[in-house]
Swiss-Prot record:
The gene is rplO. Part of the 50S ribosomal subunit. Binds to the 23S rRNA. Belongs to the universal ribosomal protein uL15 family. Keywords: Ribonucleoprotein, Ribosomal protein, RNA-binding, rRNA-binding. GO terms for biological process: translation. GO terms for cellular component: cytosolic large ribosomal subunit. InterPro entries: Ribosomal_uL15, Ribosomal_uL15/eL18, Ribosomal_uL15/eL18_sf, Ribosomal_uL15_bac-type, Ribosomal_uL15_CS. This is Large ribosomal subunit protein uL15. The keyword Transmembrane does not apply.
């Protein structure tokens, strides 16, 4: 085998299509672009997603209703008023609330909201607090840990 004997495999090389070189060449006259219209003209065509001036789908979609959030943040929610039955200086976590029966299902990390009143000092450990809940827990002498 010598370099002078090497040749590409049969069928691996394809000739470039030469358009606009007469009718006999197969792609003469309009070069395969049809008669008229925007797609037959020279230069760039339309951008991706262009729908002829109509509001394109990618701009219509957010305006429509009933689209679900792809990755929603789900929390197990407890209001401050539900914590009044607990004894003073108790450490409140999602597990302790489930054991006490205040929360029945684990829907995700614990979030404490500020509805209701609290008169007992508690050590609350949760993933998130509303501003009102944090103020009420600390006003009752408790602490909040995220």
């Amino acid at each position: 085998m010598k370099l002078s004997n090497l040749s590409p495999k049969a069928g691996s090389k394809k000739r470039r299509r030469r358009v606009g070189r007469g009718i006999a060449a197969g792609q003469g006259a309009s070069c395969g672009f049809g008669m008229r219209g925007q797609k037959s003209r020279s230069g760039t065509g339309t951008k991706a997603g262009f729908e002829g001036g109509q509001m394109p789908l990618y701009r219509r979609v957010p305006k429509l209703k009933h689209f679900t959030i792809v990755n929603p943040k789900n929390f197990t929610i407890v209001n401050v008023g539900q914590l009044t039955d607990l004894p003073a200086n108790t450490e409140v976590t999602l597990e302790s609330l489930m054991a006490a029966g205040i929360v029945t299902t684990n829907d995700g990390p614990l979030k404490v909201l500020g509805d209701g009143e609290l008169s007992v000092a508690l050590k609350v450990t949760a993933a998130a607090f509303s501003n009102g809940a944090k103020a009420k827990i600390e006003a009752a002498g408790g602490s909040c840990e995220a």
